[in-house]
């Protein structure tokens, strides 16, 4: 069990690496479908609504995508549905459900 845990940790990128890579990769929701799993991205748009648990609906005005925002990150963000936001995270592809974004940073965009 410990070996599996260490191996899984070795494959995961640290948040600071994701932030560096995403700073150079501003994309639209429609472009995400063409990206590989674990690609670091930055998105700007509107947080539409909280769906359940860590899942939120996001739109960049062109397309919609699900955001997976951990509870501790969400509580610290002071963001609510309808806010314009900038999201930094990783593309998370799945075999049997739609692609989403695993969020490592979210901040409100002031108008």
Language-model regions, residue ranges each:
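OB-fold and OB-like single-stranded nucleic-acid-recognition modules
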Residues: 9-111
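Bacterial N-terminal signal peptides
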Residues: 1-5
């Amino acid at each position: 069990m410990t070996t599996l845990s260490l191996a899984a940790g070795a494959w995961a990128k640290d948040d600071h690496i994701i932030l560096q890579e995403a700073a150079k990769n501003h994309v639209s929701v429609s472009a995400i479908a063409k990206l590989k799993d674990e690609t670091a991205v930055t998105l700007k748009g509107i947080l539409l609504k909280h769906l359940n648990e860590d899942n939120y609906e996001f739109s960049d005005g062109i397309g919609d995508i699900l955001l997976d925002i951990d509870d501790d990150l969400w509580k610290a963000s002071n963001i609510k549905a309808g806010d314009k936001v900038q999201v930094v995270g990783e593309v998370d592809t799945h075999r049997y459900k739609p692609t989403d974004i695993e969020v490592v940073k979210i901040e409100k965009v002031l108008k």
